[in-house]
Amino acid sequence: MVSRRFAVVLLCSALGGIGCQGRASGATPKEGPMLLAVGAKVPNLTGTDQHGAEHRLADSTGHPLLVYFYPKDATPGCTKDACAFRDVWKRFEQQGVTLYGVSRDDQASHAKFAAKYQLPFPLIADPSGAWEHAFGVPNNNGKSTRVSFLFDARGRLAHVYPKVDPGVHAEQVLGDVARLGSGQ
C-alpha cells in the first residue's frame, strides 16, 4: 500500500514538474505571426484601393516603398497617422517613395476616409487579411496591428516599425528614406 501511494505521488510530481518546466521555459501555447524580416523581398500581392484601382507590390521596385498597416479608418490614431503622411506627402513624392496604407476596412470605407481627410495615397482594402498574413502583421479582434514596412529600391525590406507612434512616424520614415538614398 505504501509503495503504491509512493508511486502515485512520484507520478504526480513528475507530471507537475513537466508542466512547471514548460512554463519556466517561457513557452506559450499559441505564438503570434512573425513579422516579415529585414532583407526579405517585397511580397507578391495585388490589392484594390479606395478608387477601385489595382496595385501590385511587385511593380513597386526601383524606388522606396512604404506599406503601413493600421487598425481602422477614421479612428483617432489612424487618422493622425494618415494625416501626418498627407501633410508631408510632397516630401515623399520628392524622394520617390510609393506609399500604401492597408487595413481590413472595405473599399467604400477607405473611399470615405480618404475623401474626408484628402489623403493623396492609396488605401488598400484587405478584408480577407491576405496582406496582413503575408507581412506577418498580428490581428487584434479583426483589426490589423499598427506596423509599417520600408523597402529599398531593390525591393528588399530595410526597416520594420513594429511600434508606431502616429505623431512622429511620418518624419521617422522620411529620415530613414534619406539614409537609404545615402547608403547608410
Please tell me what each predicted stretch does.
Residues 45-65:
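A short beta-strand-turn-helix
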Residues 19-44:
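N-proximal helix/coil linker or "cap" segments that precede and/or mark the start of modular domains
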Residues 79-117, 128-133:
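Structural microenvironment flanking redox-active thiols in thiol-disulfide oxidoreductases
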Residues 1-8:
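Bacterial N-terminal signal peptides that target proteins for export
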Residues 144-184:
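Thiol-/selenol-based redox modules, centered on thioredoxin-like
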Residues 8-17:
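Bacterial N-terminal signal peptides
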Residues 58-79, 85:
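Short active-site neighborhood of thiol/selenol oxidoreductases, capturing the structured segment around
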Residues 42-43, 64, 145-147:
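Short loop/turn microsegments at loop-to-beta-strand junctions
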